[in-house]
Amino acid sequence: MAEKNHKPILIVIAGPNGSGKTTITSKVLHHEWLEDAIYVNPDQIAQDKFGNWNDQDSVLKAAQYCEKLREECLRNRRSLIFETVLSTTSKVDFIKRAKEAGFFIRLFFVSTESPLINASRVAARVMEGGHDVPIPKIISRYTKSILNCAAVSPFCDRTYIYDNSINGREAQLLFRMSDGIIKKRYTDNMPEWTTEIIPSN
């Protein structure tokens, strides 16, 4: 246990657009794990550093800036936390490289039972001034995100899987994994979307 405490820590909050990542992040940020960690937040950087999170140029610049920041943390073995849709292999690759570099990795993954739920939430978020994501992207990223969670969980020291399908209710912790193996189940009623993540043996 003492050895773990000397490792740099990587916290990844992942899930399809509109699943509720930011709510989980706001809770995790207060944890003692992250006392010296850098929070890499592209939305905040797009707004604060480049002017507007709904402007495509600002979003692109913020994404590039965040990628450099993550790579610097990896190179310097500096603890960090970031949110991701996890729909591309680049983030999977980053997590694998962090594992090879000796980081202690915690993955918090949250999804819903249908991408239509996610699309409606993103639409509501836009009405309140939040950033937009086109519906076709939300739908295509939904499955990719879940499949990539399954691919990367064996490289994570701790993985926490949440379902956030019910509006107005806190996301439900379904199960916890270590190195891709389920260590604790918190419910007997697993949503269908988790079948891609739950190990077959």
Which stretches of residues belong to each language-model region?
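Conserved substrate/cofactor phosphate-moiety recognition/catalytic segment
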Residues: 26-78
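Glycine-rich phosphate-binding loop used to anchor ATP phosphates in small-molecule kinases
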Residues: 61-110, 145, 160
